[in-house]
Each structure stands twice: as C-alpha cells, then as structure tokens.
Amino acid sequence: MQSETLLETLQNLPDQSGVYHYFDSRSKLLYVGKAKSLKKRVKSYFQFTPTLAPSPKLSPRIHKMISEAAFIRYIVVENEHDALILENSLIKQLKPKYNILLRDDKTYPYIYFDENESFPRLEITRKILPHKGVRYFGPYTTGARELLESLYELLPLVQKKGCLKAQKACLFYQIHRCLAPCESKISKERYGEIFKEALGLLQNHSKLISRLKERMEKLAENLRFEEAGELRDRIEKIKRIEAFSGIDLARLEDLDILAIATSGKHSMLTRLFMREGKVVSSTSTPLKAQEGLDEEEAYRRAILHYYDSFMPLPPKQILLPLELESKRELEAHLEGLFGRKIPLHHPKQGSKKALIDLALKNAEELLRLEGEKEEIPLLESLQELLGLESLPRRIEAFDTSHLRGEACVGAMVVYEEGFCKESYRRYALEGRDEYSQMREMLGRRAEAFDRESPPDLWLLDGGLGQIRLAQEIIESLGANVEIIAIAKEKIDAKAHRAKGAAKDILRTPTEEIRLLPSDKRLQLLQKIRDEVHRFAITYHRQQKLKKDRQIDLLEIKGIKKGKLKRLLDFFGSFEAIREASFEELCKVVSEGEARAILEASF
C-alpha cells in the first residue's frame, strides 16, 4: 500500500455522491463502490495511524483488498441513485477482483398473448412489448418452448402468426390442427372457449402432462414410436417446471424469492419465481467473491444485476432471508425502473417464510452438487497451475482463419460447464495479417463488455505476442480478464498444427508451461482450442464459398479477374461494390462493365 498516494487522495475527496475505484500498484482494478459522500465512505476503509492501514472493522475480503490498494480514482455524480446505476454498470463491464460477481444469465422467456386480438395466439418473448393489453406468463427458466408446442398440438389454435392475414385455410386445417378462423369456419366465441382451455392447461401443468400422456399412449398404440418418444422427452421437460408448482399461496401473489447458501469459498444464489400464487420456475447461479462473501452486498448486487426495465412481468414483492441496510435505496431504484413500488420483504413466519426456507434449501443442495462436479477440482487445479486470481468457470477462446489474405474471419467460442453455443460469435475481419486480425477481433469483443460481461479467462491461439496484444486491449478498458495462450511447439522454426507432429505449450504472461499429453488440464484447453479452430475454419469456408460464387457470377457477366482485383482494391469488399452507383463503378471499369455489375445479383 503506497500511503503517500492514498493519503493525498483521501485528503482531497469531495463530500459528494459518486463512484470510487481501487487499483493495485500495477494499475489493476481491485474494487468498485458507490457512496452518498465519497469523503466519508472512502475514508471509512482506513485507520489513520502514523502509517495508513486498513480499518479493523472491515470484512476479511475488503481488508485484503485495501492492503493491496495503491491508489484511488473516483467519479462525481448528481446523486446517490446515479451512483448506484453507475456502480452496477461498471462492475458488470470491468469485473473488479474483489467485487461480488454474478454470472450474466440470459433473459428468461415469457409466454404471452394479446387480449386485443379476436383470435389470439400464444407466443414467446424475452422483453416487454410496447402495446397495451398483453398478458404474460412466466418467467420460464426451462420448458417454455415445450409448453407452447404441447398446447398447439393438443388444441386447434391459430398455428402461425400470418395465418389470419392469408384469409384462406391452410395445411393445418386439413390435418385438423386449426379450425380456420381465416375463412370464418369458427366463431369468435367458440374459439374463445378453446383458448380459455389452453390457458387453463398452461397454468395447470399436471393436467397438461396427463393430456400429453394420453396422446403419447395413442401414438405408441399406432406404432408411431418416434413421435411417442419425442412426446415423452417433452413431458420430462415440463415435469421440471412442475417440480415446484405444488407450492401454493392462498392469495394469487407475484413474488420473487432470493436466497444465498455459502460453504467455504463457494456460494450459490437461488431465485424462485412465483406468479399468481404458484412457483412457476427457479434458477441458480454460483457467486464469485475473493476471500469470503458479504451477504448484504451479495443481495444488493443480485437485485441490481437481475432487475431491469425490460422485464415483462416484474414481481409485486421480493422476499429475502435478511433485512438489507440498503433497502430504501434499492426500493427507490426498483420504483424508478417499473413505475411502482416493489417492496423488499424479510418474512419471519408463515407461508412466505416457508418460501425463503425452500429457496435456501435448494441453494444448499445445488451448492453441494456444485462441489461434487468433476470439473470443479479440474478448474481449481488449472487455476493453481496458471496462477489465476479466480476460478476459470467461463472461458472465451479466439482464433482467426484466412487463405492468403482472403475471406479473413475470426471466431470466439465460450466454455462454461460445456460449450455454450448460443454465446459463440463470428467476426468478418478487415486486417491482412494475423496480429491485426486478432487485435480487431479482441477489440470488438472488449467493446461489447457492457452488453456481454467479460469472462474469467481468455484463451488465445499463439504465444507471448498475442498475450501482450490482448493485455493492451484489456488494460485500456480497465477491465479484469486473465489471459493465456496455447500453441504447438516449433520444429525447424515452424509450428505444426497436425496432430502428433508437435506438443502443445501453454503460455501465461510470465512463464511457459509444458504438460504431458495425458494431463487433464491440458486436454481441457486443447478441447476448447480445437473447437474454436473448427468454428473459425467453418466460417472461413462459408465466406470463401460465398466470395467464389460472387467472382464466378461477375466473370460470367464479362468482368475478368484483373478488373475484379481493381474493383476490390478500390471498394474494399463485394458489399461495397454491390452498393456502388453507376458513376462510382465507372471510375474503375468501363460503362458496359458497370452496367453488367449493376445487373448482376451477387
């Protein structure tokens, strides 16, 4: 701790609301916090002895953070609410070492229908819709698609969004899956009765499962075993939603229940979603915190992290197993988001206390199962081997691909308890060499940290040069992402990708690590590297094929390769050539060739 630097800052702190950042001696971000008064809050971390020292009142985690702190930076804002918003945004983007971090869960789907429609349909959305008269059901952490498919299979609802516009009965009418309201073959009143039945099944999963089982048995009797098997799998997924639906409140309340279980260094947050008196779904996520968990801060972070104005069906109340000191400011924040009060309630008895107990029980069980996962010891061993500050639960790997500078592309894959294919990203790159391509790709990924939070670890295909390049990008943003690389050892000054030709070498910012081929840690990183290489190659081939087709088409139109090269050099891409005007094309080719290009569909 550099006392002079810190002391100078502490003596000049303003008595205003703001957000403060602690950094270590290497300018690495340690912690982000907010304050009603920067002067009072930041000073509370210290005791002013002859040498500046951490306050004895601090938790072990924050005490350790202060002992590593070298300097402080701060941002002044208008009020405490603005400080709260900015703090939450910066923690999501920068992932400071000592803040409590939550995984970015995807937005959960809701099932909805529009009450204004004469013949309504059930559909899925992940965000609030702009018009009035929309009724939502959910959120569903699993099984939303299966619920919808089941209802459309069991009942003759309007199957597709565009059906009514067609004004003509389609195939669904012929196979008895729709009653053709488009041709007025069913009245609005009769359709309303069928739709009411669908809503009843949507809200009573036991009854829905019973109907699906009857259909499954009929399919099996008719030797339609494949369809019966698909229905069986769908029933199993709906049963997972059903797991909590036996819990019922006498009043039809909309509640969210949050609970955190902690064991040693590991913590688990569980959320139960109750709508109209029934628990409709649940989700859990591990929490990351260096040197122990502060429960007050953890619940505050969870509320700020998971509740935003795009939520279609916010709860009427949030239940917590403790009374939060920051309750008033959080309730004011929620009221600002949703335009109504959402109380944070700590029930001490009754049915709501039972819901808290249930959430805690689930958090404890999931934490136990998390500790038993085979991958956790492997990740802990990898953390120790690579000298990482946190467990590498979420790993992003990058690779580029091109053929002599053509169809330059990049790819990113994500590994978190397996490959997360919905998080994969592809990049069309403009750089002509591997370093500029990697810089462009990593820069674009880093710029998206505000929308998609940073991972624990970046895995690059290369060596120290690639690591330093990535470090520049991360440090320029002040984010916390650890970086390693993997590459084939060089034989005759060449790196051989072919399997068996050379061993893989791991590289951290400070050392080179060689492991036996049988080492599970190496095999995990190789598996991730091979997946991103496959993903990049596949995208490159698609782009190359597209480009070859464009070249072939233009050659058919009489544009020779020499002219094509001049066009690409001048415009930069086929997209730019396609969008160019006749006058712009004539700067490079003849008028006849310009007309041929404008007529070509490439």
From Swiss-Prot:
InterPro entries, A to Z: GIY-YIG_endonuc, GIY-YIG_endonuc_sf, GIY-YIG_UvrC_Cho, RuvA_2-like, UVR_dom, UVR_dom_sf, UvrABC_protein_C, UvrC
Any GO molecular function: DNA binding
Residue pairs linked by disulfide bridges in the UniProt entry = none
Which BP terms from GO are recorded? nucleotide-excision repair; SOS response
Give GO cellular component annotations, separated by semicolons: cytoplasm; excinuclease repair complex
Could you tell me which Gene3D superfamilies the record lists for this protein?
5' to 3' exonuclease, C-terminal subdomain, GIY-YIG endonuclease, UVR domain, UvrC, RNAse H endonuclease domain
Query: What name goes with this protein?
Result: UvrABC system protein C
Checking SMART domains in the record gives:
GIYc (SM00465)
* Start and end residues of each UVR domain: 206-241
What is the name of the gene encoding this protein? uvrC
What this chain does, per the entry, is described as: The UvrABC repair system catalyzes the recognition and processing of DNA lesions. UvrC both incises the 5' and 3' sides of the lesion. The N-terminal half is responsible for the 3' incision and the C-terminal half is responsible for the 5' incision.
Domain GIY-YIG, by residue range, is: 15-100
Keywords (alphabetical) are: Cytoplasm, DNA damage, DNA excision, DNA repair, Excision nuclease, SOS response
Known partners and oligomeric status: Interacts with UvrB in an incision complex.
List each coiled-coil range: none
Which subcellular locations apply to this protein?
A: Cytoplasm
What Pfam families does this protein map onto? GIY-YIG, UVR, UvrC_RNaseH, UvrC_RNaseH_dom
Q: Which HAMAP family match?
A: UvrC
Q: Does the keyword rRNA processing apply?
A: no
State the family it belongs to.
Belongs to the UvrC family.
